[in-house]
A protein has these predicted regions:
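Short, conserved micro-motifs composed of acidic
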Residues: 37-60
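Secondary-structure capping and boundary motifs in well-ordered enzyme cores
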Residues: 12-15, 54, 87-90, 159-163, ...
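A short, polar/acidic, helix/strand-boundary loop motif
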Residues: 183-214, 218
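Acidic, metal-ligating active-site segments
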Residues: 166-191
């Protein structure tokens, strides 16, 4: 039997201790040693044996990298990629390797996808060398993609009252939706981007009105 990593959450370190004991007992009954425990709570980790803890500072949850010390999430995979590319084939590789399920990095990745679409429209071959203008444009895009790994987003959003709002918009090149969570703590309200979706406009030209309707559609789907 193979058991991969599991992820869960509780409100307090006391509840975490109880869950740890229950999980250990349950898996031990099946002769499975549940180990490599990690948490953003130092108190919880101190209560458990050191042999059960992981030494890693960062972990992945559903493909999203998490820093347990700072309790932040970030996009991994762009800092070590080479953006010195000269062909469509080389440009597509770094763009496709950036994993961003929450689409929090859409402002940076959308420009890269639009660039790839432009190459297709111009019927560029896979290994055809970029023109000087395309090379300069890609250099700017690559710089923005490289910065993604340095961006840290708070994982925890506290509050006792919550409201979800979504905003949509469109241009001739793309349409998008952004979902914000408004939370209130002691009368102070904060807004955090929690999810977004951006799509490139089809190669067949559509009116701005239709693209705005498509933006409203994906915005509604984001909430449902």
């Amino acid at each position: 039997m193979y058991v991969d990593h599991m992820s869960t959450g509780v409100e307090t370190s006391t509840q975490a201790d109880e869950q740890y004991k229950e999980a250990k007992t349950l898996f031990q009954s099946a002769s499975i040693n549940l180990r490599e425990w990690a948490s953003n709570s130092p108190k919880f980790l101190e209560n458990g044996p050191e042999c059960d803890r992981t030494s890693a500072e960062t972990m992945k949850v559903l493909g999203t990298s998490c820093n347990l010390t700072t309790d932040t999430i970030f996009t991994n995979g762009s800092h070590h990629l080479s953006f010195e590319v000269t062909t469509k084939r080389e440009a597509l590789q770094p763009v496709s390797r950036i994993y961003d399920p929450l689409r929090l990095c859409s402002p940076a990745t959308l420009n890269a996808r639009l660039f790839i679409q432009e190459l297709w429209k111009r019927q560029k071959d896979w290994d055809e060398t970029f023109s000087q203008s395309h090379q300069q444009e890609w250099s700017k895009i690559g710089e923005n993609l490289t910065l993604l790994s340095s961006q840290r987003i708070p994982r925890y959003i506290g509050g006792d009252k919550y409201k979800l709002f979504y905003f949509t918009d469109a241009s001739a090149k793309a349409y998008s939706a952004a979902v914000y969570l408004f939370s209130s703590v002691n009368g102070k309200t904060t807004a955090n981007l929690v999810f977004s979706k951006a799509r490139i406009a089809p190669a067949k030209q559509l009116t701005i009105t239709r693209l705005k309707l498509l933006g409203a559609l994906i915005g509604t789907r984001c909430l449902n």
